[in-house]
Design a protein with these regions (language model features):
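An anionic, glycine-rich sequence signature occurring as long contiguous blocks
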Residues: 14, 138-164, 168, 224, ...
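Short, basic/hydrophobic alpha-helical segments
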Residues: 80-85, 170-194
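Electropositive nucleic-acid engagement tracts
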Residues: 28-30, 35, 39-108, 244-284
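Short, surface-exposed basic-aromatic patches at helix termini and helix-loop junctions that form
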Residues: 93, 188, 208-218
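Glycine-rich phosphate-binding "P-loop"
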Residues: 8-9, 159-178
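Acidic, metal-coordinating catalytic cores used for nucleic-acid/nucleotide bond scission
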Residues: 197-205, 225-227
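Active-site-proximal, Lys/Arg-enriched surface segment
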Residues: 69-152, 157, 162, 298-305
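Basic, low-complexity segments
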Residues: 1-25
Length: 326
């Protein structure tokens, strides 16, 4: 869309934003929302507070205070967005996307900032990270939730958290746990996904995969080549036993002595007859700007090694390689 088309949508945008009026306690605070959202949708080269405010003819400090000091009900706004998506865009073939965003930040005052992996620049950098849940169906897509990842170093320093305005109830949670909470909130508001998809940052976490399976959610996950699994479920002993005939009986399940060790996906591809002897199947994924993207794939069933080291859920494994860019 060009700038004229966006400006032509102003009446529609105004009506849409009116649906969030009850999320603000004060009318003067509420009035800044159209200014900020309109600036984000504009063709301004920079979309921070100052250029947005100057373009709208308001004082930059006013818009800065709107974002940093004024109060609104964030939870109600999030729930309202999800309810509108359910009402207007629910349908078949809906996909949920779990992903994270990292923003490079200088200094050490911004909540959650520290030197950590920054996907935006592809290396460790001083940045903050947020975990997001997106929704897509047909030609519609939007973000429906997100939350800040608070590193352990921050969580353990409550004085630093208070100085940054982080409430006491906000503590360190692994990113996969944040993702499950986003998913549960969306489901609680009636939003459903035919499939959920995410990269290996989440696909490598057995507790996350198990959590989705426990909730009955289908998913397509990227997993690393080190992902640990079996080609078929190994035998497990459930009866109590004593190690060496001494001590207290152990009652938790364990792998039987004759159980095979789990294998990485990389080793499974090399050594498992189910994959090793299977021919590659070629697919044209898409025609890109640099030419066609062609993948070759193999498929088999595997049993995931869970967080306790025991056989977990059964999964379909699709191994893919890029033929033209190996």
């Amino acid at each position: 869309m060009n700038a004229d088309q966006i400006r032509g949508l102003k009446p529609t945008l105004t009506r849409y934003l009116k649906r969030f009026d009850d999320c603000f306690a004060r009318c003067d605070t509420r009035a800044h929302l159209p200014v900020y959202v309109g600036g984000q949708l504009s063709d301004l080269p920079a979309k921070s507070c100052e250029p947005i405010a100057l373009a709208a003819g308001v004082a930059p400090r006013t818009l800065q205070e709107f974002l940093s000091q004024h109060c609104w009900d964030e939870g109600r706004m999030r729930d309202r967005v999800q309810e509108l998506v359910v009402r207007d865009h629910a349908g078949p073939n809906s996909i949920g996307i779990i992903d994270e965003t990292s923003d490079v930040k200088k200094g050490d005052k911004t909540p959650g900032v520290q030197r950590q992996w920054c996907g935006k620049v592809g290396k460790k950098e001083n940045c903050l990270v947020t975990v997001h849940l997106g929704y897509a169906t047909g030609d519609f897509h939007c973000l429906v939730d997100g939350d800040l990842f608070l590193p352990e170093s921050w969580s353990e320093d409550r004085g630093r958290c208070r100085a940054a305005g982080i409430p006491n109830e906000v503590v360190y949670r692994p990113k996969w746990q944040i993702a499950l909470e986003l998913f549960d909130r969306a489901r609680g508001n009636g939003l459903t996904f035919d499939w959920l998809t995410f990269d290996e940052g989440y696909g490598s976490k057995p507790l996350f995969l198990q959590g989705l399976d426990d909730r009955g959610q289908l998913f397509v996950a990227e997993v690393p080549v080190t992902f640990s699994c079996w080609s078929e479920a190994p035998p497990v002993a459930h009866r109590p036993y004593r190690r060496g005939g001494r001590g207290r009986s152990r009652k938790t399940p364990r792998l039987r002595c004759d159980a095979p060790a789990p294998m990485s996906v990389k080793d499974l591809l090399k050594h498992s007859p189910a994959l090793r002897d299977q021919p590659w199947v070629r697919y044209l994924v898409k025609d890109g700007l640099k030419g066609p993207m062609v993948w070759e794939t193999k498929h088999t069933r595997i049993v995931m090694k869970n967080a306790a080291g025991l056989p977990g859920i059964e999964l379909h494994l699709v191994v893919a390689r890029n033929v033209l860019d190996p």
